[in-house]
Amino acid sequence: MIEEEVLKIIKPTEEDKKGIEKVLEIIRERLNKLDFEVEGSFRKGTWLRQDTDIDVFVFYPKDVGKEYLERNALNDIINRIKDLDYTLAYAEHPYVIVNINNVEVDIVPALRVESGDKAITAVDRTPFHTKYVTSHLDERGKDEVRLLKRFMKGIGVYGAELKVQGFSGYATELLIIYYGNFRKVLEEASKWKHPIKIELTKPMKIFSEPLIIPDPVDPKRNVTAAVSLKNIATFSIAAKYYLKNPSIEFFFPSKKVEEKVKGDVLILRLNLDEKSSEDIVWGQIKRSVNKIERALKQYGFRVIDVQAWGDTNNITIAVQLESKNIGQYYLNIGPQYYSGTIEDFIQKNDNIWVGEDGRLYSIKERKEYDAETIAKKNIVLKVKYNIESYWLQNTEDQQIMKFLRKTPTWLK
């Protein structure tokens, strides 16, 4: 059975666990006498082999407040690990990423609160998530979560960060707890029609998102608020096709051969000079993508697709047009002859005539007719960056080929 094959690949071995424990031993020594806990998928037993990010939360009394976490707590943590390979990262507040033996450990300052619904910062709920999941999943359930995570990774809908807008690890765990197993999740997801409500607890507010899973530890929060409709639809379609024809391709998509360039494709390579929060950068990138598409359409280009991918330092924006060539002049359609606005139209336009349909027309010159210039002008990044741009001829870049292909490998 395919799921058993996949599980053999993704389930950590005892050797893997020992390797993680050795790394944690180093961290435990550094955080000695602090109130800290290992959280996340490693603690819950739902982590995937070779996906070895570990979450360690250092808790401080809730009375010290959020500002204390950003300054005092962070400095305390840095002083304890400063001789190790570490970098600063940014979410709601800064935290530290330590790299030991190619294992990333996120050390996150948080506030110790009485319950999940009393959280002051988003991460304060984490220990309650851990307790909820570990008390509702047995060993088989943890394997079912692993299968669901790998399936979602394979089809590109895993990850709650703004760049992906997909399912979080916690969301996959709740789906398994609610439906019972991997296959059952797919059976139900294949029939989804939004809005979809999955209630492990009664919600404490009205949610408007397409997929609603009230958080069992804080019912005022929707666990899947960040999941885009595109990713919900992709997951539902993938579930339907997997149940019809199970294949390892859903879990581990193959790389396809070179895809033909259709239309004209502009590639914009952005290299960011400054470090910033991933969600902040990707919020600006997504706004840029939308702005580029709107502007090109406004100037008369027929846009096929605009997408972006990359990390927080190197980002690619791909713009696919039916054609990059567009006339310097265009037909401007005016009002009907009996309209009260014809005088205004005549005053503002040249080369005016009355059409056979009784409507006024004119010829106007486009303010801008170079697609590359328009695209560059509509990038709205607030950090400094360098940009390289070119029109695609051919490529061996897997991400660009994926962009050109459009169709996921599991679909066809």
From Swiss-Prot:
Record's keyword terms, sorted: ATP-binding, Magnesium, Metal-binding, Nucleotide-binding, Nucleotidyltransferase, RNA repair, RNA-binding, Transferase, tRNA processing
UniProt-annotated binding residues for CTP: S41, K44, H129, K149, Y158
Superkingdom of this protein's organism: Archaea
CDD domains: NT_2-5OAS_ClassI-CCAase
Catalytic activity: a tRNA precursor + 2 CTP + ATP = a tRNA with a 3' CCA end + 3 diphosphate; a tRNA with a 3' CCA end + 2 CTP + ATP = a tRNA with a 3' CCACCA end + 3 diphosphate
Pfam families assigned: CAA_C, NTP_transf_2, tRNA_NucTransf2
Coiled coil start-end: none
Subunit structure: Homodimer.
Family: Belongs to the tRNA nucleotidyltransferase/poly(A) polymerase family. Archaeal CCA-adding enzyme subfamily.
Remaining remarks: A single active site specifically recognizes both ATP and CTP and is responsible for their addition.
Record's protein name: CCA-adding enzyme
Annotated organism of origin: Saccharolobus solfataricus (strain ATCC 35092 / DSM 1617 / JCM 11322 / P2)
